[in-house]
């Protein structure tokens, strides 16, 4: 026999079980679930939604305006890049990985190339000029990525001016990228052993102009939002995630640093000579969306400082390793053919050196051979730790390449930052996570 009672304070119904009455217990449980079903609603936000930063699907269970459960649905942008890498040589792989996190392509390329170079044992042989240019491009890319995060986040919360300002400054940076690499995005400019080509003649002038105008432009963006009453009302205390939650979920990047922990791989595990640059690791202790916004704004100023140091350190020299078994036998200057082959090089391999022609053909078609082994390398992308686990079986193609994309890992924070808050606050919380679905789904 079972009896049900309701406490005097009007709390949940209590079912007391006396034995041999399982069907009554089940009936009471079903009745309770049915009563709650009328109050709770499951809502799909996305995958086609302007505020989900791509094809992200949020399954929200709501009770009134309060989110009681939040889950992510991913996979809508799966492209099979990691599998495709197993069917391309080590150099061709760069053209695939640059398309993953499409807002920070230089970080994808650098992480991949650092892994290949570590397997080859040539990490310390990379020309100084190539490393400095890598750092310069990554920091400009960090600024452009953060500008998109602030612009889209502002648009979603109604700050349209922030969107116009953010995309205006990003456009200036993309013009420089196009001048240097030939493409605004998906550059495939960083290659194992160095770079695809040296900087064009006017690149330094363009970058200098950029670092002159960016501080004032970024200050304009700060003036719009830092003390904006509506902006603070929508972000302060919203999307709260403390240090314990970040460590439990493996969260990195601005979200982790917004808890006060100064973890940045550029300082903790330097690569590309970052130990030679002076910059601060920006932290905040608010643990909320506003703190992450402040971190991204201040990080852009630090990136400008690093780019200025890169310009000062940039000395003439090669941009590709000198080992002819690894580097294409060309000077890699952009020639009239548009493919990076100078007339002098073409004349040499076509007319005066049959061995050079054969070697060039094998390097381009078959690719370099990488010793067997496995490595893990990581860089500090705009979203956190971007890691690459790379396995070689001694052939001309990777046996396996796996990316630890920070967007994928950080999406685990959706439930922790959204549950218990308002539906409208989920927009601000996801915007502060700044996921890029190209990196999540790969």
Curated annotation (Swiss-Prot):
Enzyme's top EC category: translocase
Presence of keyword Transport: yes
Molecular functions per Gene Ontology: NAD binding; NADH:ubiquinone reductase (non-electrogenic) activity; quinone binding
Keyword Membrane: yes
Subcellular location: Cell membrane
Catalytic reactions of this protein: a quinone + NADH + 5 H(+)(in) = a quinol + NAD(+) + 4 H(+)(out)
Membrane topology classification: Peripheral membrane protein
Protein keywords: Cell membrane, Membrane, NAD, Quinone, Translocase, Transport
Catalytic activity, EC: 7.1.1.-
Cellular component aspect of the GO annotation: plasma membrane
Primary location class: membrane
Family matches, as HAMAP family: NDH1_NuoD
Function: NDH-1 shuttles electrons from NADH, via FMN and iron-sulfur (Fe-S) centers, to quinones in the respiratory chain. The immediate electron acceptor for the enzyme in this species is believed to be a menaquinone. Couples the redox reaction to proton translocation (for every two electrons transferred, four hydrogen ions are translocated across the cytoplasmic membrane), and thus conserves the redox energy in a proton gradient.
Membership in a protein family: Belongs to the complex I 49 kDa subunit family.
Assembly and interaction partners: NDH-1 is composed of 14 different subunits. Subunits NuoB, C, D, E, F, and G constitute the peripheral sector of the complex.
Protein name per the record: NADH-quinone oxidoreductase subunit D
Protein encoded by which gene: nuoD
């Amino acid at each position: 026999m079972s009896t049900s009672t309701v406490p005097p304070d009007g709390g949940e119904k209590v079912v007391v079980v006396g034995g041999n009455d399982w069907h009554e217990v089940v009936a009471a449980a079903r009745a309770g679930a049915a009563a709650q079903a009328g109050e709770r609603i499951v809502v799909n936000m996305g995958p086609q939604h302007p505020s989900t930063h791509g094809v992200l699907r949020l399954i929200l269970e709501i009770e009134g305006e309060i989110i009681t459960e939040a889950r992510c649905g991913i996979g809508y942008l799966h492209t099979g890049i990691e599998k495709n890498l197993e069917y391309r040589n080590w150099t061709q792989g760069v053209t695939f990985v640059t398309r993953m996190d499409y807002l920070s392509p230089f970080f994808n390329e650098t992480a991949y190339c650092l892994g290949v170079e570590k397997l080859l044992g040539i990490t310390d042989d990379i020309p100084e000029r190539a490393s400095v240019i890598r750092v310069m491009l990554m920091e400009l890319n960090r600024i452009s990525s953060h500008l998109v995060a602030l612009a889209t986040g502002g648009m979603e919360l109604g700050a349209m001016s922030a969107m116009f300002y953010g995309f205006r400054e990003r456009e200036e940076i993309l013009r420089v990228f196009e001048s240097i690499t030939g493409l605004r995005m998906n550059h495939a400019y960083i290659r194992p052993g160095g770079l695809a080509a040296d900087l064009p003649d006017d690149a330094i002038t363009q970058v200098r102009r950029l670092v002159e105008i960016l501080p004032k432009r970024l200050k304009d963006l700060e003036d719009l939002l830092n003390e904006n009453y509506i902006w603070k009302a929508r972000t302060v205390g919203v999307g709260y995630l403390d240090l314990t939650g970040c460590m439990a979920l493996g969260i990195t990047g601005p979200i982790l640093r917004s808890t006060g922990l100064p973890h940045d791989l550029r300082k903790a595990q330097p690569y590309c000579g970052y130990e030679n640059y002076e910059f601060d690791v920006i932290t905040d202790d608010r643990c909320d969306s506003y703190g992450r916004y402040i971190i991204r704004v201040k990080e852009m100023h630090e990136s400008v400082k690093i780019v200025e140091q890169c310009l000062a350190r940039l000395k003439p020299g090669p941009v590709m390793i000198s080992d002819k078994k690894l580097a294409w036998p060309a000077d890699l200057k952009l020639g009239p053919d548009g493919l990076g082959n100078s007339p002098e090089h073409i004349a040499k391999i076509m007319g005066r050196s049959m061995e050079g022609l054969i070697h060039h053909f094998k390097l381009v078609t078959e690719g370099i051979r990488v010793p067997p082994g496995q490595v893990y390398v990581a860089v500090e992308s705009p979203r956190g730790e971007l890691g690459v686990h790379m396995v070689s079986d001694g052939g001309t193609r990777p046996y396996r390449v796996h990316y630890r994309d920070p967007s994928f890992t950080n999406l685990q924070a959706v439930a922790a930052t959204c549950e218990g808050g308002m539906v409208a606050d989920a927009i601000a919380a996801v915007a502060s996570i700044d996921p890029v679905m190209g990196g999540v789904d790969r």
